């Protein structure tokens, strides 16, 4: 499950950073944390895989100008059905029915109704005078009393800068005051409120519990312990599972990477990478690559770079150190994260999966390959990058997330020469990958064929669960895997980067393969299954992809389609089109992979009109049986 943080028009950069940093220790052990914009909220089926939506501090008017009726409806429905919403300062104003924000200069006043209306009343502010936009001139260490967090009320101080007070909370039976300002009249004292909305939970704040005392001239480090307890309490009110001990949680530091094997192809890759180092540097290159022989303590080579853009904070150029050389030493270094010796035996003969870079902690396997162009130019088909933990993972669209340990995250290269464009059905590769994931799971070993993994068009893998998933055609499903395919055309070669993430051993509440294995093993009548390993699963998936890729190029997609249909969820499904009307899914074209949908009339009877839907232009919302346009 995801925790989404809005990162679009209106969101303050510093508030985004503080929100990310403060929530990370509580969230990432159990959830994936993603940044999303208004387009994502409108067009992606995010509610089905989301536990919490966070609207950070910033400008409420920016949110209003970017959100449309579809977004408001999706957020409201998400909460009413059991989701959670956290509104911090501007996000608190935004979640109220009425905003009454008044400044000494009346031209700066913001007064009016809002559409989410989780709090049925008015959020009035600034609670304290002196606020100035884009400044800390009016910021203060607000004294508050928190009720319900412990057996008796707790006094602490929290960062304040322009936030509001929630008025007349006593008039609403579904509203509970969590914290009150101590330095205001009682009627303006509600600083944090909890609201029950349908089956869901909402917390709105006028203060900034996400701001730590670290580096702050306003806050006192003596309040940090209570601030963290307050954050934990807020997340529990929102229905999230929170680790008891967060001291060992949070985002680990980026690590060195390990290149395997030490063979002729790997050496050619390094030589080519060094040859591609030119004076006229590519503007979009993100990293400095530093290749070091593991037998030597001194780096031997460096590739030039420009600055990093993947970080949330301003930073200098980032160095990515890649060790190569002696296989025994490389395997020993990588083994805590990935057993390269075992993997090499399992992947033998496959065109994909070697050479491989193993990174215990990486920003993104996809970004490393497709946003570093000289590095990309040096790779051959099959070159693979695996990360145990991604701090800025990428999915379909332009959004990033922090993926927790237990996710098998990898990306690999397919190079297509310009002369072969007309005979290479590139659009079908994402279908092959989805099928390879399903078959890689089901053919992991004898007995695993009963793992209920299925394909959701166009590029996701879902598993059937007993409870807690999306109700689809009378059964419950949860997302297990997502796939992304990106491309770069350079020097008469189209470089395709196929990225995939599979939940293998994630901690709850999300589903993972090993939780399915645990459930299977609880039944004594079932033959006992061993838990999935990263090494064996990656080899199984890539071997399957290799088989389908060969078959596609040699025989065509029509021979693969029957097997694809065996595992996809959409045969003869009646769907709603976002453009209006309904249709019945007929299948997929064997040339370009278009989804075929036969339109229905107002009586839900088939017409003669069939529409072709592109996989890269549309998204499937299982929860609502809805196909929407995607950008």
UniProtKB/Swiss-Prot annotation:
| Record-linked PROSITE patterns | BPL_LPL_CATALYTIC
Per the record, its GO cellular-component terms are: cytoplasm
Q: What is this protein called?
A: Biotin--protein ligase
Annotated coiled-coil segments of the chain = none
Taxonomic placement: Eukaryota, Fungi, Dikarya, Ascomycota, Taphrinomycotina
CDD domains for the chain: BPL, GATase1_ScBLP_like
As for subcellular location, the record says: Cytoplasm
One Pfam match, by short name? Answer: BPL_LplA_LipB
What this protein catalyses is: apo-[methylmalonyl-CoA:pyruvate carboxytransferase] + biotin + ATP = holo-[methylmalonyl-CoA:pyruvate carboxytransferase] + AMP + diphosphate + H(+); apo-[propionyl-CoA:carbon-dioxide ligase (ADP-forming)] + biotin + ATP = holo-[propionyl-CoA:carbon-dioxide ligase (ADP-forming)] + AMP + diphosphate + H(+); apo-[3-methylcrotonoyl-CoA:carbon-dioxide ligase (ADP-forming)] + biotin + ATP = holo-[3-methylcrotonoyl-CoA:carbon-dioxide ligase (ADP-forming)] + AMP + diphosphate + H(+); biotin + L-lysyl-[protein] + ATP = N(6)-biotinyl-L-lysyl-[protein] + AMP + diphosphate + H(+)
Q: Which gene encodes it?
A: bpl1
Alphabetical UniProt keywords: ATP-binding, Cytoplasm, Ligase, Multifunctional enzyme, Nucleotide-binding
Q: Assembly and partners? A: Monomer.
**Which EC number(s) does UniProt give?**
6.3.4.-, 6.3.4.9, 6.3.4.10, 6.3.4.11
Family the entry assigns: Belongs to the biotin--protein ligase family.
Q: Which GO terms describe its biological process?
A: protein maturation; protein modification process
Top EC class, one word:
ligase
Primary site of residence? cytoplasm
């Amino acid at each position: 499950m995801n925790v989404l943080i809005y990162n679009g028009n209106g969101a303050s950069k510093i508030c985004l950073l503080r929100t990310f940093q403060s929530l990370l220790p509580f969230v990432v052990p159990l959830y994936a944390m993603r940044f999303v914009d208004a387009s994502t909220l409108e067009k992606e089926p995010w509610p089905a895989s989301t536990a919490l939506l966070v609207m950070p501090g910033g400008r409420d008017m920016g949110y209003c100008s970017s959100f449309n009726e579809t977004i408001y409806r999706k957020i409201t429905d998400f909460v009413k059905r059991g989701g959670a919403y956290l509104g911090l300062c501007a996000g608190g104003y935004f979640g109220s029915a009425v905003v009454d924000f008044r400044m000494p200069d009346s031209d700066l006043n913001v007064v009016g109704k809002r559409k989410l209306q989780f709090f049925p009343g008015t959020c009035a502010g600034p609670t304290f005078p002196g606020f100035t936009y884009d400044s800390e001139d009016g910021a203060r260490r607000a004294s508050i009393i928190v009720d319900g967090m412990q057996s008796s009320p707790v006094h602490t101080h929290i960062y304040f800068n322009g936030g509001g007070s929630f008025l007349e909370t006593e008039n609403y039976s579904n509203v509970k005051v969590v914290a009150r300002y101590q330095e205001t009249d009682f009627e303006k004292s509600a600083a944090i409120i909890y609201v029950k909305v349908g089956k869901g939970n909402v917390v709105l704040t006028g203060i900034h519990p996400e701001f730590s005392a670290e580096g702050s001239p306003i806050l006192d480090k003596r309040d940090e312990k209570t601030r963290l307890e307050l954050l934990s309490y807020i997340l529990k009110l929102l229905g999230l599972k929170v680790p008891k001990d967060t001291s060992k949680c949070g985002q680990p530091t980026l690590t060195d990477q390990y290149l395997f094997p030490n063979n002729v192809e790997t050496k050619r890759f390094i030589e080519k990478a060094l040859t591609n180092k030119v004076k006229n540097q590519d503007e979009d290159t993100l990293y400095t690559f530093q290749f070091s022989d593991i037998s030597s303590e001194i780096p031997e080579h460096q590739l030039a770079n420009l600055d990093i853009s993947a970080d949330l904070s301003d930073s200098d150029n980032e160095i990515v150190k890649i060790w190569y050389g002696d296989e025994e030493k490389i395997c020993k270094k990588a083994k805590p994260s990935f057993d390269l010796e075992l993997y090499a035996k399992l992947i033998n003969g496959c065109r994909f999966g070697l050479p491989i870079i193993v990174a215990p902690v990486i920003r993104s396997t996809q970004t490393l390959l497709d946003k570093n162009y000289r590095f990309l130019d040096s790779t051959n088909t099959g070159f693979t990058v695996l990360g145990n933990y991604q701090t800025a993972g990428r999915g379909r669209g332009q959004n990033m997330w922090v993926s927790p340990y237990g996710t098998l995250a990898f990306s690999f290269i397919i190079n297509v020469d310009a002369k072969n464009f007309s005979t290479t059905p590139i659009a079908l590769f994402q279908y092959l990958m989805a099928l390879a994931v399903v078959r890689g799971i089901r053919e992991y070993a004898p007995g695993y064929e009963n793992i209920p993994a299925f394909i959701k068009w166009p590029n996701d893998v879902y598993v059937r669960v007993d409870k807690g998933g999306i109700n689809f055609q009378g059964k419950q499903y949860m997302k297990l895997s997502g796939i992304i395919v990106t491309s770069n055309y350079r020097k008469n070669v189209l470089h395709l980067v196929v990225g995939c993430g599979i939940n293998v051993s994630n901690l709850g509440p999300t589903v993972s393969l090993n939780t399915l294995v645990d459930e299977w093993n609880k039944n004594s009548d079932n033959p006992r299954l061993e838990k999935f390993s990263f090494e064996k699963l990656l080899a199984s998936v890539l071997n399957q992809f290799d088989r389908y890729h060969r078959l596609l190029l040699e025989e065509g997609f029509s021979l693969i389609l029957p097997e694809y249909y065996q595992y996809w969820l959409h045969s003869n499904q009646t769907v709603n089109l976002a453009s209006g009307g309904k249709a019945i899914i007929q299948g997929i074209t064997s040339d370009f992979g278009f989804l075929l949908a036969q339109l229905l009339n107002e009586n839900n009877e088939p017409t003669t009109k069939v529409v072709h839907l592109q996989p890269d232009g549309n998204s499937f919302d299982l929860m609502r049986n809805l196909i929407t346009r995607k950008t």
